[in-house]
């Protein structure tokens, strides 16, 4: 075996139709099915199962006992061809589950790049997760949830199906959201999460200056503190968006809501 050949434990079971790039590592008792592609530099730990159709990019790490690309947990699923697509440099800790899409929901579940999904995270069918997200232990996304970039979800938090969580949002421990969470927003730790301000600390860590954060806070106060009906708040946000691309991003998110906005 050459140095750059896949390194596969003798107890692993790899379907002949699976395609593993150079230097992929596969741990003990792992199962990789047909129609699975795994990019270079990826490490699949012990006791994992990966089912196709699944496409996995470069330099990902599956620590152990992860269940990847399984059939969607949707009674309407009738065996149609659907897929899971994972980007690059993600880390999936113990017992993470990622399901493929459904025919009625677009047929695809997607995970972006540079995400960190901790133990027992579940991402259901037809979800779309962006880049640089952190999902703490037992994070649960129901079907059709969309998560923007740089979102942090704390332990035992979850999102109702079809919800959207905007970029840079933060969900506290145990928060359960049944509505859309605007970008930059913090959601509280009560049983039904409610907005609790702006994720200021996270924005500072990502290089947002005081002027940008101030504009976002003003928009938040307009939306959540001023007591305005949503239609009136949107009028004021439209004015504020002229001077702030971040406020414009919030307004665009609100305008495209399919579920009620979390308020």
From Swiss-Prot:
InterPro entries: Acetyltransf_C (IPR029098), Acetyltransf_C_sf (IPR037157), Hexapep (IPR001451), Lipid_A_LpxA (IPR010137), Trimer_LpxA-like_sf (IPR011004). It comes from the Bacteria. Belongs to the transferase hexapeptide repeat family. LpxA subfamily. This is Acyl-[acyl-carrier-protein]--UDP-N-acetylglucosamine O-acyltransferase. GO terms for molecular function: acyl-[acyl-carrier-protein]-UDP-N-acetylglucosamine O-acyltransferase activity. GO terms for cellular component: cytoplasm; membrane. Pfam families: Acetyltransf_11, Hexapep. It is an enzyme of class 2 (transferase). The gene is lpxA. The keyword Transferase applies.
């Amino acid at each position: 075996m050459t140095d750059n050949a896949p390194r596969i434990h003798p107890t692993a079971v790899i379907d002949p139709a699976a395609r593993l790039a150079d230097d992929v590592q596969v741990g003990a008792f792992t199962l990789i099915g047909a129609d699975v592609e795994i990019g270079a530099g990826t490490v699949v730990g012990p006791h994992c199962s990966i089912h196709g159709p699944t496409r996995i990019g470069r330099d990902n790490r599956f620590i152990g006992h992860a269940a990847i690309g399984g059939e969607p947990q949707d009674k309407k699923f009738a065996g149609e061809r659907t897929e899971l697509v994972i980007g690059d440099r993600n880390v999936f800790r113990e017992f993470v589950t990622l399901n493929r899409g459904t025919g009625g929901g677009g047929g695809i579940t997607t995970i972006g790049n540079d995400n960190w999904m901790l133990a027992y995270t579940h991402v259901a069918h037809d979800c779309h997760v962006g880049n640089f997200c952190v999902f703490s232990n037992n994070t649960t996304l129901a079907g059709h949830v969309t998560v923007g970039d740089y979102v942090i979800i704390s332990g035992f938090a979850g999102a109702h199906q079809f919800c959207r969580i905007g970029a840079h949002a933060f969900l506290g421990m145990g928060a359960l959201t049944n509505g859309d969470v605007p970008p930059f927003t913090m959601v509280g730790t009560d049983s039904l999460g409610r907005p609790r301000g702006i994720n200021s600390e996270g924005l500072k860590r990502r290089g947002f200056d005081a002027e940008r954060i101030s504009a976002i806070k003003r928009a938040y106060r307009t939306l959540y503190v001023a007591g305005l009906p949503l239609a009136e708040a949107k009028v004021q946000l439209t004015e504020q968006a002229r001077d702030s691309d971040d406020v414009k991003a919030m307004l665009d998110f609100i305008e495209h809501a399919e579920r009620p906005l979390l308020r």
